[in-house]
Regions:
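Residue-level marker for beta-strand->alpha-helix junctions and adjacent short loops that shape enzyme
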Residues: 23-24, 53, 83
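Short, solvent-exposed loop/turn segments at secondary-structure boundaries
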Residues: 28-31, 60, 99
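Primarily recognizes the serine-hydrolase "nucleophile elbow" in alpha/beta-hydrolase
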Residues: 1-41
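Short beta-strand/loop motif that positions the catalytic acidic residue
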Residues: 42, 48-50
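Conserved alpha/beta-hydrolase "acid-adjacent" motif
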Residues: 55-64
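Alpha/beta-hydrolase-fold catalytic nucleophile elbow
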Residues: 17-20, 49, 79-82
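C-terminal catalytic histidine-bearing segment of alpha/beta-hydrolase fold enzymes
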Residues: 70-118
């Protein structure tokens, strides 16, 4: 959610990478809208990585994220990993770490950042 919010509020960002990205559909409190409602403010391309076993965000939440970005005309690409849950790159936590998903996501995010940032 932090990466999503940064992309919404920092127009100078050239790229946004989201890993796991939960709570995007939940209002921030204090009368502020849910981050998903701010998708139209995102001006940079977005890449996202999600585990299909994650409960926050669920695969259905990720579908909603993609629809919101598409409706806002935001170029984005999401990757999902079977057998991976939340924080699948957290190698110090063996019950979360998914080596195959982690390595694939890392290669993809590096390629994305190289392409977008030059």
């Amino acid at each position: 959610r932090v990466a999503w919010l940064a992309a919404c509020h920092i127009p100078e960002l050239a790229a946004c990478a989201i890993f796991y990205g939960g709570r995007v559909k939940i209002p921030l409190g204090g009368g502020h809208p849910a981050p998903i409602e701010l998708a139209g403010k995102i001006q940079c391309p977005v890449i996202g990585f999600f585990g299909n076993e994650d409960r926050n965000p669920t695969p259905e939440d990720v579908d909603d994220y993609s629809r919101a970005l598409s409706a806002a005309g935001v170029r984005h690409e999401f990757f999902r990993y079977d057998g991976a849950g939340h924080a699948f790159q957290n190698f110090p936590t063996p019950e979360r770490y998914n080596e195959a998903a982690s390595e694939d996501a890392w290669e993809k995010v590096l390629a994305f950042l190289t392409r977008e940032l030059g």
